[in-house]
Amino acid sequence: MNRRLKNYLSVGIFAFFGGGLRAYLNLIWSQTGTLTANIIGCFLLAFFTYFFVEYREGRDWLVTGLSTGFVGSFTTFSSFNLDTLKQLESGMNSQATIYFFSSIFIGFLFAYLGMLVGKRTGRKLAEKA
């Protein structure tokens, strides 16, 4: 199978699971589903990125599928903005401000943690290979 087709299929398959998991999170945590998905996604995207940089054994289709497919469909910038806008429109200005800034701060923190864990895990596997 050619490389481009593998990447497209990988994105589609992983997106199915990422989108499904996000829909499930929104069902069980209707108020915090978007925030939870985005924070987990920040960790995962950084983890996958730095893991495969260190490990160097990643297949293009796997890296593309996990990052663009799974994490891309799991997280949502548009819902984050819409949630903030709805809170502002409802007069919940304090809650909207807290939601907005905590999403950015906590997301950055989890991306940083994902980077650290991804680097460490990738290095350990690379040493064993």
Swiss-Prot record:
Q: Which GO terms describe its biological process?
A: cellular detoxification of fluoride
Highest taxon of source? Bacteria
Give me the reactions it catalyses. fluoride(in) = fluoride(out)
User: Per the record's keyword annotation, is Chaperone included, yes or no?
Assistant: no
Q: Which GO terms describe its molecular function?
A: fluoride channel activity; metal ion binding
- Give the binding site residues for Na(+): G72, T75
Give the record's keywords alphabetically: Cell membrane, Ion channel, Ion transport, Membrane, Metal-binding, Sodium, Transmembrane, Transmembrane helix, Transport
- InterPro entries membership: FluC (IPR003691)
TM segments? 9-29, 33-53, 62-82, 98-118
Topology of the protein relative to the lipid bilayer: Multi-pass membrane protein
Q: How is its activity regulated?
A: Na(+) is not transported, but it plays an essential structural role and its presence is essential for fluoride channel function.
Q: Please report a single Pfam family linked to this protein.
A: CRCB
Its cellular-component GO annotations read: plasma membrane
Q: Where in the cell is it found?
A: Cell membrane
Task: Provide the family line.
Answer: Belongs to the fluoride channel Fluc/FEX (TC 1.A.43) family.
Purpose of the protein: Fluoride-specific ion channel. Important for reducing fluoride concentration in the cell, thus reducing its toxicity.
Q: What is this protein called?
A: Fluoride-specific ion channel FluC 1
Q: Which organism is it from?
A: Lactobacillus johnsonii (strain CNCM I-12250 / La1 / NCC 533)
